[in-house]
């Protein structure tokens, strides 16, 4: 079993017969497997706890990566300070309940009908504004208490001071729940390419990390999102959500929104998307445009919320937990709404992210309600062994 379900029995164990002990163990394993807890890496959407094998890709240019990869620990980020100004109620861990401050991917606003800026900020507490010299340039996503994930093409500027604004739905004003945090380190993928063919077509390895100068204080408005494992599979035609502020303007149109926007999109099959872009761009069919590290999502009405170039996160919900599955990377332009935007597929870069975090633990998804309700029986079985 994986770390998620591992238990250690200590002290003297009462003697039991071999058949009864084997039967109890078999029942325990079946219960845990049915609860989705055979191993953290095997649960759909969970981060794998297995040590990554691929060590060929390093992070550059401003970061030193460790020679060996850290294992993911069954723990939350090192800092869990709760600000009293925004934390109204603590949620103790009990049967059927999970402390949201000790897990990732938890949204503090469960009512999707609420559209006011404060409610939207609580609904997407991992959203941050990436800023250069104090001006918003892209969206970013909190993945750990000191780390923000974004796209590499937003980090190419030299001689600028990067910072992030967290906890605020507003792009141009501070609130009581918001804070500006300076960036300590900028990390870009070593194989990032601004273009593979021409102009806007086919950015490769468009991913970057920002290490903050201080750890974030989590609240209802500031929380990390969960990362998918390498075996995460998103079914075609799944419905997910894009959130962010969008472009400042495109061809004199689409003024940037002052508050966080949200848009539901439909996941497309990569092969169909690749065929579409071959017809759209006239690139020879022998050349693969949509790589396995990319993904497509259909959104045919982008005239108002244009988000193709600014790193907006693509997030999907599974059993009440939100996962970061993609980052907006490139596209044909919002005026060509029939062309689906292309996202970087986050699960393809799990190893790279592990390397660059250099041992800082990621928050893990909270155990499902099924598991919490099933645990008393396995524990009683263990006590009988």
From Swiss-Prot:
One of its GO terms (cellular component) is cytoplasm. The active site is at residues 153, 206, 310. Its EC number is 3.4.25.-. Pfam families: Trypsin. Testis specific. Differentially expressed in some breast cancer tissues. Residues 1-39 form the signal peptide. The keyword Coiled coil does not apply. Residues 93-358 form the Peptidase S1 domain. Keywords: Disulfide bond, Endoplasmic reticulum, Glycoprotein, Hydrolase, Protease, Signal, Threonine protease. InterPro entries: Peptidase_S1_PA, Peptidase_S1_PA_chymotrypsin, Peptidase_S1A, Trypsin_dom. Disulfide bonds join 138-154, 240-316, 273-296, 306-334. CDD domains: Tryp_SPc. One of its GO terms (molecular function) is serine-type endopeptidase activity. Glycans are attached at residues 133, 279. It is found in: Endoplasmic reticulum. May be involved in proteolysis through its threonine endopeptidase activity. Belongs to the peptidase S1 family. DNA hypomethylation is accompanied by the expression of the gene in the testis. This is Probable threonine protease PRSS50. It comes from Homo sapiens (Human). The lineage of its organism: Eukaryota, Metazoa, Chordata, Craniata, Vertebrata. The gene is PRSS50.
């Amino acid at each position: 079993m994986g770390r998620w379900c591992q238990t250690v029995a200590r002290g003297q164990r009462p003697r039991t017969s071999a058949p009864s002990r084997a039967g109890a163990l078999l029942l325990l394993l079946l219960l845990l497997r049915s609860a989705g807890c055979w191993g953290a890496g095997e649960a759909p959407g969970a981060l794998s706890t297995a040590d990554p094998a691929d060590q060929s890709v390093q992070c550059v240019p401003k970061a030193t990566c460790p020679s060996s990869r850290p294992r993911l620990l069954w723990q939350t980020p090192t800092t869990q300070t709760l600000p009293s100004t925004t934390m109204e109620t603590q949620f103790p861990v009990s049967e059927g309940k999970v402390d949201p401050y000790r897990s990732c991917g938890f949204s503090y606003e469960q009512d999707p009908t609420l559209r006011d800026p404060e409610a939207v900020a609580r609904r997407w507490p991992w959203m941050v504004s990436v800023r250069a010299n104090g001006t918003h340039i892209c969206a970013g996503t909190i993945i750990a208490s000191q780390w923000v994930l974004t796209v590499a093409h937003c980090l190419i500027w030299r001689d600028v001071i990067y910072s992030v604004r967290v906890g605020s739905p507003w792009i141009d004003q501070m609130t009581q729940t918001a804070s500006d945090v300076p960036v300590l380190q900028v990390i870009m993928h070593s194989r990032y390419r601004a273009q593979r063919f021409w102009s806007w077509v086919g950015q490769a390895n468009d991913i970057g990390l920002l290490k903050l100068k201080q750890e974030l204080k989590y609240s209802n408005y500031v929380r990390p999102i969960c990362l998918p494992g390498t075996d995460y599979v998103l079914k075609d035609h799944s419905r997910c959500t894009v959130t962010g502020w969008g472009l400042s303007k495109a061809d004199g149109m689409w003024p940037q929104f002052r508050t966080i926007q949200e848009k539901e999109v439909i996941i497309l099959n990569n092969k169909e998307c690749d065929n579409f872009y071959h017809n759209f761009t006239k690139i020879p069919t022998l050349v693969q445009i949509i790589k396995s590290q990319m993904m497509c999502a259909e959104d045919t009405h982008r005239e108002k919320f244009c988000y193709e170039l600014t790193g907006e996160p693509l997030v999907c919900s599974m059993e009440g937990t939100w996962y970061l599955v993609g980052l907006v990377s490139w596209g044909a332009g919002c005026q060509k709404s029939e062309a689906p935007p292309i996202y970087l597929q986050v699960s393809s870069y799990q190893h790279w992210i592990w390397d660059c975090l250099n041992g800082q633990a990621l928050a893990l998804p909270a155990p499902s309600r099924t598991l919490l309700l099933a645990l008393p029986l396995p524990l009683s079985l263990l006590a009988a062994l």
